[in-house]
Amino acid sequence: MAEHGESSEDRISEIDYEFLAELSARFGMNLVQLAKSQEEEDHKERMKMKKGFNSQMRSEAKRLKTFESYDTFRSWTPQEMAAAGFYHTGVKLGVQCFCCSLILFGNSLRKLPIERHKKLRPECEFLQGKDVGNIGKYDIRVKSPEKMLRGGKARYHEEEARLESFEDWPFYAHGTSPRVLSAAGFVFTGKRDTVQCFSCGGSLGNWEEGDDPWKEHAKWFPKCEFLQSKKSSEEIAQYIQGYEGFVHVTGEHFVKSWVRRELPMVSAYCNDSVFANEELRMDMFKDWPQESPVGVEALVRAGFFYTGKKDIVRCFSCGGCLEKWAEGDDPMEDHIKFFPECVFLQTLKSSAEVIPTLQSQYALPEATETTRESNHGDAAAVHSTVVDLGRSEAQWFQEARSLSEQLRDTYTKTSFCHMNLPEVCSSLGTDHLLSCDVSIISKHISQPVQGALTIPEVFSNLSSVMCVEGEAGSGKTTFLKRIAFLWASGCCPLLYRFQLVFYLSLSSITPDQGLDNIICTQLLGAGGCISEVCLSSSIQQLQHQVLFLLDDYSGLASLPQALHTLITKNYLFRTCLLIAVHTNRVRDIRPYLGTSLEIQEFPFYNTVFVLRKFFSHDIICVEKLIIYFSENKDLQGVYKTPLFVAAVCNDWNQNASAQDDFQDVTLFHSYMQYLSLKYKATAESLQATVSSCGQLALTGLFSSCFEFNSDDLAEAGVDEDVKLTTFLMSKFTAQRLRPVYRFLGPLFQEFLAAVRLTELLSSDRQEDQDLGLYYLRQIDSPLKAINSFNIFLYYVSSHSSSKAAPTVVSHLLQLVDEKESLENMSENEDYMKLHPQTFLWFQFVRGLWLVSPESFSSFVSEHLLRLALIFAYESNTVAECSPFILQFLRGRTLALRVLNLEYFWDHPESLLLLRSLKVSINGNKMSSYVDYSFKTYFENLQPPAINEEYTSAFEHVSEWRRNFAQDEEIIKNYENIWPRALPDISEGYWNLSPKPCKIPKLEVQVNNMGPADQALLQVLMEVFSASQSIEFHLFNSSGFLESIRPALELSKASVTKCSMSRLELSRAEQELLLTLPALQSLEVSETNQLPDQLFHNLHKFLGLKELCVRLDGKPDVLSVLPEEFLNLHHMEKLSIRTSTESDLSKLVKFIQNFPNLHVFHLKCDFLSNCESLMTALASCKKLREIEFSGQCFEAMTFVNILPNFVSLKILSLKGQQFADKETSEKFAQALGSLRNLEELLVPTGDGIHQVAKLIVRQCLQLPCLRVLAFHDILDDESVIEIGAATSGSFQKLENLDISMNHKITEEGYRNFFQALDNLPNLQMLNICRNIPGRIQVQATTVKALCHCVSRLPSLTRLGMLSWLLDEEDMKVINDVKERHPQSKRLTIFWKWIVPFSPVVLE
């Protein structure tokens, strides 16, 4: 290490790019690019952070404390990181070494933090084992005193002499002043930061900044004569009372401890491993191959335990594995050779010379062994012996000491340490759970304040009567056993103060048993014995040095008298008791508790810790699990307790496929299997409990209830006092008048509800079936099925029975047609709070519905079909469900990927029922959407002058573009991480050869693509060959058609439609298109070129029915169409848009030869031959849609033929000018004859303005009208006609557009708002104005608007640009929006995007 306080600033890389490339390939993600970007960001953060030796984080316990707010979804546990020298910085997820300042932001499943630390900073002095002041998490301040101070005791009576001893005081302890220490009577011993009182001999170490030497002296050695000479008894008492933890504990309790010190275990990094104990390591070699040439004893001494596979052994400390042992191999030498930095080896080496000395020092004191001075104030006072004890007292002392020895032997045996789990979890090793720190909070009985505690803090605060409460399987037993093991192993100095520790299971005792009998039976075994008198004497004499760990507490009434008294009258005995109790059993013991500890949910990093150790031979399956949960954050909480982890370990052991296809439902199945094995003797009782709890879960789920009271339980038939219930539900009583019950998790509630629903639907009782149908029918919309109840239905399918499945399938497949439910979709807020990720899913689905109802329908249909098929196949009822499935498929459009479903392999003929299949091919060629030109509208517009309170009505385009660019960048990054996948044609129908049936119609959507690669071409060739008809929709994909020429040439007779937008067609591509003989529809729009070769030869498409050309600003389109085009008599749609002058005579000839024309759109700027055009149109009796724009229109000529179009559904004359009143009146009268009209965009002009009221009245006679638009013609009188004429009229109106009507005054708007009513289907209302015509309105008008909006129940879009609204106005409008039936969908557009900032008036 450099000088203390300095650190290397070299750039470091935490990423294993070789492994990352492997991971990218495995999961189809480009993680390397993402990692490089993240690494650069981390480096910038690293450069900002403070470096240098951090003496405040020398303590491992303090480092551990910094992780309280750490993200639990990580691969490293806080214990591993703190032991490796790291503390949480609070900057993102960054951790930093207290010694070398190494900063890490990432975790690694394959590399532990200590390994990552060694790789990146091998020179770190902490790692090298040098004295940098590290304080182990279980270490204590009290140290064993030196036999003789340097220079003799007498010389240190003077403070200056004591001060001189601190000449080599270590750098890391400078936070504690040598002057203050010497003043408090301490002398530096020269070892680490250990000091010793010259008077009483008390020795203390582990000094940290802020420590008060006088306080420490008073706490640990209150009888010191020097201390008493300097401080009054009151001051000493205050010091002791204000000390945190260690109540009633002094230094004497630690120094006189009977616990053997396991010296090689001083390292903080390995003192949690139970395999630090040689006997436990030895026990793991029971199945060691007999033919192995290496002795088990040598392997054990070298720190190894057997993994159970081949001849592979693993070091308990460094985790290193060795195998393939040969004759003559020395395990210790090989350990040193391959893993020289192993902490166990280093500690073993450094302790080799010290062990004999310390072992004799720590030997149990005997009256005849003392050689110390008899001075009362000397060190001998601390090491007092039993020389003054009477004979009877000496007897209890010897028996107690012997008992302590027997207890320690018991707690370090495998039979004690191994988890007592039934056979479902029997393979879970001892080391995997005892090494995990549970998450604990402390709740002081007399105070509502709760606080998180680390395990060292718990151990420091053990006193009086305490309980540790938690769910069934939360780790209470493990926690108590861990305390007993750590005490017995000598690895935990914090527990040295206890001379006797009794772990007693209360589930196997009877009320008439004596305490001595219980201890003998449970802990001492055959031959073990302790007298009641001796036990009583030991408890009375040792008091606070006795710790009872009472497991499986169920109530005071069932306890033997001795234990009952210890709990209820602890003030008489002053022993320490820690009682493990289920959460719902705490109430009757609470009056006797000082502190209650509560075990929280099992952190996910503990799950990873266990699985990483248990499946170290197959780490890939653990990686898959982590990725699964990273993609499904809502499911991370399923590992609520260690018991769930044990269940999945068992499932993975028994079912290898579960490792590759992990699903949360298998976890719950494994957990229920565990319960069935645990309670197989009472199977009927278990079934009844699961059934009643399932009923409660089901009722709660459908009423959005996730908390229950006693009445709810009683109504569902749940017995809250039955122990089985505690494995399914939790009881919460803290700070509540009545207890509240919850299931082990929201997902577990859904799982039990699913079990119950299947039970009901499968029942032979009609009442049960009816109840099941009642619940099933509450899932009455597709959105509920694929969102709020998606997980629930998935769980139901995993239990599906042959009787229930057809009922569920029929119901699900009928939901897609529930249109009314779709229009009233709203999320379940209570459910969303529990499943925040589901809320994002809901937002996506709702957004899809708003943007593209057609895509939403296809998406929902596919999802429901997949779910229905899961039910059918899981229950083996495909034949019974097929009629429902076939009916569902008829006439429907679905995604191509559904053909991978097994059903289309089994029933390929069902393919013929579909209307079409869609496939999308998306590339990375971004089309810029931010280059729109604002010049057309804004170039001659002056910035508006407005009051400051209205400036929020305008947003500068640069800000808008900046936000859009950020979104675009996010999209690019996402696409780089997730490469575009090829259409999947690997399963189901695609495995049939030959294909018995073809896809009726294939719709191919290609977006932002360049030329296709060979892999995509191969896929398209196979898909095209399996299609009867193919339709192309290409957007921003120049060069794509040429690249798939081989596929098109093989299937050219199948291509019926080609729609192309924003792309350039090469000459080769135009020639390729001309070879498609079956083309019926051709669309070309928004291109920068005129594909003249294609257009010159349009007549070669003999089956062409639709031609759509939208090329604003390009050369005259009509001029390049061939004369032979008129021979295409089947034309049904002709849409021409060009902004140049056109010769309409050719167009007239075309129309005259198109008798089947249904749709006609025209935009151009030439007026000649208009009358002949209208005459030609009049002959088209089948026209359903007419749109005119540009300058090609003569009003009277068109009005004269308008009554001929009795089948007309859409008439768009937006922007056409009707100047005279006579023509306008005739137009209004003609409208009355268009009884089938659905959409009307009214023309403009003075004439139309004069007859606007008449037009409104005529529209009232149009029963099918859905869209109505008036621009620039309405005034106060005419607009009120619309409002006043709504009684019984406009019932189907969905879109009312009255924007840009600047003749309407504020009063006119107000009257209109007050009158508008009874439009039940109106979804869009547009009242926008242009910027010069902006309007500033009074509060009464805003109020009228709000009342109007509240009377339009289907409104989802309100446009009101140029309405100047202040903060108060928007508050009123937003309040109405929140209360509106469509509040989740209603969007209000009121803000202009402009290339200027408004002028603010003073």
UniProtKB/Swiss-Prot annotation:
Zn(2+) binds at C315, C318, H335, C342. One of its GO terms (biological process) is apoptotic process. Pfam families: BIR, NACHT, Nlrc4-like_WHD, NLRC4_HD. GO terms for molecular function: ATP binding; cysteine-type endopeptidase inhibitor activity involved in apoptotic process; metal ion binding. Residues 464-759 form the NACHT domain. ATP binds at K476. InterPro entries: BIR_rpt, LRR_dom_sf, NACHT_NTPase, Naip, Nlrc4-like_WHD, NLRC4_HD, P-loop_NTPase. BIR repeats lie at residues 60-127, 159-227, 278-345. Signal peptide: none annotated. It comes from the Eukaryota. Keywords: Apoptosis, ATP-binding, Metal-binding, Nucleotide-binding, Repeat, Zinc. Prevents motor-neuron apoptosis induced by a variety of signals. This is Baculoviral IAP repeat-containing protein 1g. It comes from Mus musculus (Mouse).
